[in-house]
Amino acid sequence: MTFRHCVAVDLGASSGRVMLARYDSKHRTLTLREIHRFVNCLQKTDGFDTWDIDSLEKDIRLGLKKVCNEGILIDSIGIDTWGVDYVLLDKQGQRVGLPVSYRDNRTTGIMPQALVQIGKSEIYRRSGIQFLPFNTIYQLRALTKQQPELTAQVAHALLMPDYFSYRLTGEMNWEYTNATTTQLVNINTDDWDDTLLAWTGAKKSWFGRPSHPGNVIGDWICPQGNRIPVVAVASHDTASAVIASPLANKHSAYLSSGTWSLMGFESKKPYTTDEALAANITNEGGAEGRYRVLKNIMGLWLLQRVLKERRITDLPALIAQTEALPACRFLINPNDDRFINPDDMRAEIQAACRETDQPVPVSDAELARCIFDSLALLYADILHELANLRGEKFTQLHIVGGGCQNALLNQLCADACGIRVMAGPVEASTLGNIGIQLMTLDELNNVDDFRQVVSANYDLTTYIPNPDSEIARHVAQFQPKRQTKELCA
């Protein structure tokens, strides 16, 4: 067969999309077409920040039906989403309550309990995962302690992409790359860790053994009656994005830029040393047994909140105004946990500047400048941490995802990090999702083979660092500004 048609369902914390890929195996060309795009946002339910899971499922099914109604024979479907959040099911496989978002404050104070009762080094030795207050381990502890009546009804817990696959196929699956984000998977066995799971109060019977990407979960029956395989892709969206990152060699780092920024490198081994623990480095699962050694950065969430609060719709115009402003007048630590979900992001940024005796950004452009400069300097700081961890410098940084369209931030990143930046592809998570499907269909050999396809089909933009830029002169001064309460213990 010359042509393959695969559908990627890619859900982010702010939007979702159903994308159709067409792969020509003879010429190794790959094209994407957006079929359906929809909004994903938090809602308040009984005092909790929850996801409208039924609306998301409705939009997923609508997108799939649109493809089928075009008369296209779909070869496979794959679903990726953000990590850590989950859906609870009862014995009949029916949903129990609504899934609570990782941004909800129910986990406040939970992580410190684990550090005392289990021990920080012991948790890290077992999981190899960074300490974030909203990791699934702490969410489950909050659930079992705060909602025992709800907990009593639970028979299964599925992570978000596995839930949607279950709704399409009727088959339950626990995909490995996303499972590792829970901080509950043992890094040595690739299975759920009994000690960590027991601490949460959740039952091990709620979970099946994690499966690696590339297996067929089951079939979705389309309106025309065709049975279409649903593939377990690398269902954590960052894992999919990394698969589509055209990393040139071992000296290349990646930055998946969106609501969150995930900066790291690929490795055949995990890093769980005391140095890695001190830097709060995570070792999330990847495809083909690789590890995604990385750090979470708050990312463009800060900007997204400012845009929403200020009702700004013309982002290019705002960026143009921002670029005209002097650099580094206002600097914050984007990873300060005060920015996780404040009532007023603009006011929170202003307060952070005021508390550190800096000028206070007032205009929208000044707020954006503060965010961009601070992110670029944090990227440089974390890239330095990662290089020290592996004992080797990086020569190139690949920025993928929606954030790679921000040319100003890309250049600031190159200047601050002092290395060449390659930006693209934009739809990295979708492409990585498609890549695993094509491998499962025996159209591609492995991840490296797929990256050659990506490089041949998608243009990348190069940014050369300017060592004389204003931001480059602030790199050494930024470290003290990070001495705030970050997203870690």
Curated annotation (Swiss-Prot):
Residues engaged in binding ATP: A13, S14, S15, G16, R17, T259, Q304, G402
Top-level enzyme category: transferase
Recorded superkingdom: Bacteria
Disulphide linkage map: C68-C222, C353-C370, C413-C417
GO biological process: glycerol metabolic process; rhamnose catabolic process
Pathway as given in its UniProt record: Carbohydrate degradation; L-rhamnose degradation; glycerone phosphate from L-rhamnose: step 2/3
Transferase recorded as keyword: yes
InterPro entries assigned to the protein according to its UniProt record, in alphabetical order: ATPase_NBD (IPR043129), FGGY_C (IPR018485), FGGY_N (IPR018484), Rhamnulokinase (IPR013449)
Function description: Involved in the catabolism of L-rhamnose (6-deoxy-L-mannose). Catalyzes the transfer of the gamma-phosphate group from ATP to the 1-hydroxyl group of L-rhamnulose to yield L-rhamnulose 1-phosphate.
Protein name in UniProt: Rhamnulokinase
Source organism of the structure: Salmonella paratyphi B (strain ATCC BAA-1250 / SPB7)
Taxonomic lineage of the native organism: Bacteria, Pseudomonadati, Pseudomonadota, Gammaproteobacteria, Enterobacterales
